[in-house]
Amino acid sequence: MSSIDIRHAHSLPHAQARKAVQEVADKLAERFGIDYDWQGDTLNFTRSGVDGKIDLAPQSLRVTASLGFLMSAFKGPIEAEIKRVLDERFGG
């Protein structure tokens, strides 16, 4: 099993940062069929082969995920796409 751990700084107010994470989750649900739910300031997400979360904190967020065997082959492209979306939504 492979894992992803990405930390990203941001300067958005909490409500705006949470809204941006929600928009990303909505897009992932639509595009890849992920299921997600909020627990406090943590968005948990799951899909066949992927289990992860986005922890939202003041001035930063952290994306962690465990990839199943088949998804591990795509770790590089998945990380690159996560970083691209974070830069787009939260500045880089």
Labelled PLM ranges:
Residues 20, 29, 33-36, 66, ...:
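Short linear functional motifs in flexible/disordered or boundary regions
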